[in-house]
């Protein structure tokens, strides 16, 4: 492109671009990046738009102290390119945010993706033209794109909940959201800091801030089960072994339950003696909490088996935390272990043995308001210089519902999803032709390795588009009865497990007014792949083409 052409493009962007495309990808996280790469490889005229100023999705936004992936780095990476697998070398078993973000940028540079991404651009409305069989997408920069296919790579954890505590706007100190952490350094030294929330983000933030702050107050409503991460540098010989055997390891991972290479046992908990159970759990605790998920086959279907493991972890909390009352308050009860996304921590419980850390139990003494100088509970006011809100996300459906999406006949997505997210295979919806979802609700989403799931979703979607183009088909949507059958399957499978019994972001219980449903397919990534492949092999069974 010459300078004159670039100037014309810049001018168009300033006034809002008008462009007709084959495909528009919304989001440039790991799902959107791969979707852009695949679509370009098919010869489509494709563009991606991204609200952030760089690639990486959740790893662009989540820069909070201690941010780290709880999936092993050798698994949490693309498998479609052996060149990328061989050139990139992970430094730790569980990679931190800066390294994952650097990896995303490395992939984007290797594949030259950024030339087809508009950064700093957020979709505000997406409307289907029934007659023209295309989508019209408007953005917050005044752009208007028309696309035959719209690929939603908005991510399941990309809309942080906002602080809705009265008085937040009058706080005189620093206030940060973990999910929208600033890009400039934040200093904790010498400051009184409050962390609100003890889910995955809060559990990672607390140990880092505790080491630096003058005093840290941790405001906890519901205690979380968290297991030791036991992170460590990756040995070069081990990395070399993995790289040599990546093809076989990836094949196993793609057809596994979660998309990883760790072993999953087929033995029920009560099939082994109490002594053997104790030995296995102690080994898992000392090696890495991640190993707990594969110890026994019935931890999420048998409440009694689940309680055995939960009691073991409760005992560990009592061992680690010196003060018995603090240990009691940190101990989760009333919901099954692993029914909420399991957390892996680095010295989380140990942080509460520090003299500069105070646990605030919001069940016993709830937060009433934020004041100019701190946080007022029912019984006291805690004065702080900084508040960090680690209060979670409007997960799975929040990102798509934040856009004004209207399908056939002007029907809105908000109407369709009024009772919770629904789709066919988590990929296609009735009433929204040529709108494809990547890692959204109704697939394995939160229970699988997101990157391998993204690859599978994108491959299936792009294969479907190729099928349409080869056969002169203009539009595709899910058949109503196929969507109904899939949702029944998702609901019935979930109902056989312990997942729906806990108040979690899986079910939407963390967002006031959100429908309480469990929309995630729990049959595993491998079985999900088979179902999707079978549907494609049957001429895309469950879909209606025109």
Indicate where each model-derived feature is located.
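N-terminal FAD-binding dinucleotide-binding subdomain shared by FAD-dependent oxidases/monooxygenases
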Residues: 2-23, 28, 33-168, 173, ...
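Ligand/cofactor pocket segment of small-molecule handling proteins
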Residues: 206
């Amino acid at each position: 492109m010459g300078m004159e052409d670039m100037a014309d493009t810049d001018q168009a962007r300033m006034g809002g671009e008008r462009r007709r495309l084959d495909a528009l990808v919304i989001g440039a996280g790991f799902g959107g990046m791969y979707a852009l790469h695949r679509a370009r490889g098919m010869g489509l005229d494709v563009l991606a738009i991204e609200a952030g100023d760089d690639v990486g999705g959740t790893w662009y936004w989540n820069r909070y102290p201690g941010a780290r992936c709880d999936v092993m780095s050798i698994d949490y990476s693309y498998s479609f390119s052996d060149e990328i697998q061989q050139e990139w070398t992970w430094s730790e078993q569980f990679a931190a945010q800066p390294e994952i973000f650097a990896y995303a940028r490395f992939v984007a540079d290797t594949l030259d993706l950024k030339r087809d991404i508009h950064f700093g651009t957020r979709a505000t409305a997406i409307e289907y033209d029934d007659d023209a069989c295309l989508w019209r997408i408007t953005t917050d920069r005044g752009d208007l794109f028309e696309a035959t296919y719209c690929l939603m790579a908005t991510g399941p954890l990309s809309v942080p909940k906002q602080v809705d505590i009265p008085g937040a706007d009058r706080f005189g100190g620093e206030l940060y959201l973990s999910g929208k952490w600033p890009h400039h350094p934040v200093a904790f030294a010498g400051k009184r800091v409050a962390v609100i929330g003890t889910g995955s983000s809060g559990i990672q933030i607390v140990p880092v801030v505790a080491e630096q702050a003058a005093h840290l107050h941790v405001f906890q409503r519901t205690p979380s089960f968290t297991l030791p991460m036991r992170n460590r540098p990756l040995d070069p010989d081990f990395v070399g072994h993995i790289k040599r055997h990546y093809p076989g390891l990836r094949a196993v991972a793609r057809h596994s339950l979660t998309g990883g290479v760790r072993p999953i046992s087929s033995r029920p908990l009560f099939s082994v003696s109490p002594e053997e159970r104790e030995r296995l759990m102690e080994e898992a605790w000392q090696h890495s909490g991640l190993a707990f998920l594969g110890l026994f086959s019935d931890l999420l279907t048998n409440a009694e088996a689940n309680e055995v493991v939960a009691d073991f972890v409760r005992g560990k909390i009592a061992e680690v935390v010196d003060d018995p009352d603090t240990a009691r308050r940190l101990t989760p009860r009333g919901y099954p272990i692993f029914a909420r996304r399991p957390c892996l921590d680095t010295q989380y419980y140990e942080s509460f043995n520090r003299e500069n850390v105070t646990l605030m139990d919001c069940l016993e003494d709830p937060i009433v308001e934020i004041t100019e100088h701190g946080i007022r509970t029912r019984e006291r006011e805690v004065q702080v210089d900084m508040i960090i809100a680690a209060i979670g996300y409007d997960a799975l459906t929040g990102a798509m519902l934040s856009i004004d999406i209207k399908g056939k006949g002007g029907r809105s997505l908000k109407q369709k999803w009024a009772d919770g997210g629904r789709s066919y295979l988590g990929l296609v919806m009735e009433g929204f032709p040529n709108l494809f979802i990547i890692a959204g609700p109704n697939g394995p989403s939160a229970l699988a390795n997101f990157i391998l799931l993204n690859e599978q979703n994108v491959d299936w979607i792009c294969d479907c588009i190729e099928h349409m183009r080869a056969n002169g088909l203009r539009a595709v949507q899910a058949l109503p009865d196929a969507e109904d059958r899939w949702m029944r399957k998702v609901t019935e499978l979930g109902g056989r497990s312990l997942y729906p019994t806990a108040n979690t972001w899986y079910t939407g219980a963390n967002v006031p007014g959100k429908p309480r449903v469990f929309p995630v397919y729990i049959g595993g990534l491998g079985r999900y792949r088979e179902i999707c492949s079978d549907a494609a092999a049957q001429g895309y069974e469950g879909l209606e083409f025109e």
